[in-house]
Regions:
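Alpha-helical membrane-anchoring segments
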Residues: 1-263
Length: 263
């Protein structure tokens, strides 16, 4: 019999540590890219900068570099002090910085992965609030689990409605896009393996559409978590989507708590 209070504490600890890694990697990547972005004008304030309002004080070229350094520092605090008031503050600040980054770049260097990381960090901020009932902490974790499940379910439904996904053509098209940095050997050989592409596409659709079943049984939940980690690891290796791997990995422990909470 699993004790829910202990499981909740363990879940929050693991979510904090993985979310801290995700936030650190995001900041380090942007810092490493800033010279290349600056050369192309991407690091300078865009024409829509006046719409930033008061936040423009934090989003200028020099100021935002300091924000990213602060992101690494708060990520370290989140990893060191999970489940504490300091962890709560760190998660809240990191969620705010993630929002600032989305505002700063408007989706050009961030997207769904930052949205999931924002969700995980927001849930962790609630899950670590001091001097509140444990129900509030549970609500933060369960919210992340619900959003995680919805992200898979909605993606699966969208794919299931497209004939190109069932045939494997959509996956083949993604492999051929140069923007993802797909290993050079794959685009040459994969389009010839229609059965493999179709099988992989159907497998992804089934995995995403059946994700809500993870709430019904711990074994089903464990299977989904393993499949999810495999799916995101493969996507990171093939498409370079390491941010997705880290962001969703930060949220996946919430699903393990959810299935034990509702069972």
């Amino acid at each position: 019999m699993i004790e829910l209070p202990a499981l909740l504490a363990t879940t929050i600890t693991w979510m904090c540590r993985v979310a801290a890694v995700a936030a650190s990697v995001n900041a380090i990547e942007l810092l490493a890219m800033r010279h290349a972005l600056f050369a192309r004008g991407g690091w300078l304030p865009p024409p829509l900068a006046p719409q930033w309002g008061v936040w423009r004080l934090l989003l200028g070229a020099r100021a935002f570099t300091g924000v990213l350094v602060a992101q690494i520092a708060f990520a370290a605090a989140l990893a060191i002090a999970p489940g504490t008031t300091a962890g709560c503050i760190a998660a809240a600040v990191l969620a705010f910085i993630t929002w600032l980054s989305a505002l700063r770049f408007g989706g050009n260097v961030n997207g769904g992965s930052d949205a999931m990381l924002f969700t995980a960090l927001g849930g962790l901020a609630v899950g670590q609030l001091p001097s509140v009932d444990s129900v509030v902490h549970e609500a933060g974790v369960l919210y992340v689990a619900a959003q995680l499940t919805l992200s898979y379910g909605r993606a699966g439904i969208v794919k299931a409605r497209e004939r190109s996904w069932w045939s494997g053509h959509a996956l083949s098209a993604f492999l051929a896009l140069p923007a993802y940095g797909v290993p050079t050997g794959l685009p040459r050989h994969m389009p010839n393996h229609r059965l493999l592409l179709r099988s992989a596409s159907v497998g992804v659709i089934a995995f995403e559409c059946l994700s809500p079943l993870a709430w019904l049984n711990p074994i089903a939940c464990l299977v989904l978590i393993v499949l999810a980690l495999g799916f995101h690891t493969a996507a990171a290796a093939v498409f370079g989507l390491n941010r997705f791997l880290l962001a969703w990995s930060a949220a996946l422990p919430s699903l393990w708590y959810a299935v034990h909470r509702v069972a």
